[in-house]
Amino acid sequence: MRFCLVVLPIAIALLPVFQNIYIWFLLRFIIGVVATGVWLLSEVWINALAEDQHRGKIIALYSSLISLGLIVGVLISSLIPIETGGGFYVSAGIAVISAIPLWKMDDLPDFDAVEDISFYRYLVTAPGLMGSSWMMGFLYAATAALLPIFALPFVEGDYAQSSRTVAWLASGELTLPLFVGWLADRYDKTRLMIYISCVSVIALAILPVIFDIPVMRFLFLFIIGGSIMSFYSLGLTLLGQEFKGKVLASANASFIFFLSLGEILGPPVVGAAMDLFGNNAFGWFMALIGLIYLIIFIGSNASGKLKIKKI
C-alpha cells in the first residue's frame, strides 16, 4: 500500500516532464497499476471494517466521494492551462495529501493468501454481484464518452451545451447513491438491486423520447447517473455482506476486474450500436443490456448462487 502511495504522485508529476509518447505510455501504465492497488486495498479494508447494519451508508459515502473526485479532476483540467502542466502537479499534490491519512492506518485486517484465485470462479459463484460491477463500468464509460455525441442533435449542434449534459449525469452519480445506501441499511438489498435495475432500464429506454424536453432531460440524466453509481455501491455492499474473511480480498479484486472490463467494452459497443441503428440506440441499447443483467441477477438469486462465503 505504501509503495503505491509513494509511486502514484511521482508518476503523475513526471508526466509533464517528458514529451516522449512511449514514456507516457509507461507512466500511464504505472499510474494505472498503483492507483488500482490503492483502490482495491481501500475497498477491501472499508468493506472488512464496516458493520453490516451501517455498510450501505458507508459504501454509499465512499462511492459518492469517488464521483466527487472525478468531478474535481475534470474541473482541474478545465481551469488550469494545459501548456503549463500545472494540472499534473496539482493532481500529484492531491495524491500526496490523500496519502497522509492512509499512511498511518494500522488497524487493518490481515488477509491470508487465497488459493485458486479465479475471476471465473467468482463469476460462476456470484454472477449477479460481478454483473453489477460490470454494469456500472459499462454504463459509466459509455455515458461519459457518448452522451455529448448523443445530445448534439437535440441542442442544435452546440458542443458546449452537449458537453454540459454530463454534469447532470455526474450530479446523480454524486448524490443518489447516498439515498440508496440509506435504503440498503433498512430494506432488503437484493430487492433494492432489482428496483434500481428496473429504474435504469426504464429511464434509458425513455431517454431518447424525452431528451428534447429540457426539464425531463435533466431529470432523467440525474436518475440514470444515480442508478449507474448505485450498481457499484450496492454491489460492493452486497459483496462485503456475502464474502467474509480472506476470500473478500480476491472477491473484491474480481469485482474491480469486471468493472474495468465493462469500462473497456462500453464505449465501443454502444458507439457501434449508434452507428448501426441510429442516435437513439444510445439509450435503447443500454436499456437492453440492463434488461439482460436484470434477468441474470434475478435468476442467480433464485438459484441460490448469491450466498455467504466464509473461508
Q: Language-model features: where?
A:
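Intracellular juxtamembrane helix-capping segments at the cytosolic ends
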Residues: 37-50, 230-243
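A late C-terminal transmembrane helix in Major Facilitator Superfamily
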Residues: 245-276
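Helix-to-loop junctions at the C-terminal end of transmembrane segments
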Residues: 1, 81, 176-188, 274-275
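C-terminal membrane-cytosol helix-exit motif in multi-pass small-molecule transporters
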Residues: 92-111, 296-300
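Short amphipathic helix-loop junctions that connect adjacent transmembrane helices
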Residues: 145-161
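Structural signature of the two symmetry-related core transmembrane helices
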Residues: 1-13, 191-206, 287
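Loop-to-transmembrane helix entry/capping segments in MFS-fold secondary transporters
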Residues: 52-62, 159-160, 243-255
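Paired small-residue
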Residues: 22-30, 215-223
